[in-house]
Amino acid sequence: MDITQLILDEHAQQRALFAQIDSIDAKDTEALSALWTRLKNLLDAHAEAEERFFYPRLMKIGTGGNDADSAAEETEDAIEDHNDIRETGEAVDKHPVGSDSWFEAVGECNKANSDHLAEEERQGLTDFRKHATLEERHEL
């Protein structure tokens, strides 16, 4: 499968899971906890995979997509974003599930993630599609 499409598919999953959390009653802490665990695991695995496979290759072939000056800038910014998402994700776990403070922390994580997804889709993925062959995109 094309790595850029795989990344986009995972982005859609992340957005859907955040939306599902928003639609669950605060009293249903079991469902909220299960969804949050699933989402947090996806966020962590997604960031780790991008840092291990996608961004190292982008650094070699990219030139900067759209409003990014270089592939190095895209990569550096993405890793900073991933760290911000990790930190805001960890902050969620410091609050009682279903509490107002828990939902606020989930919202902060959602914002950090949403900002990152938009930037990555506009910059890194565009840059990669322009410079990687379809074969390479499938091999990764």
Regions picked out by a protein language model, each given a short descriptive name:
Residues M1-L140:
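Small-residue-biased structural context
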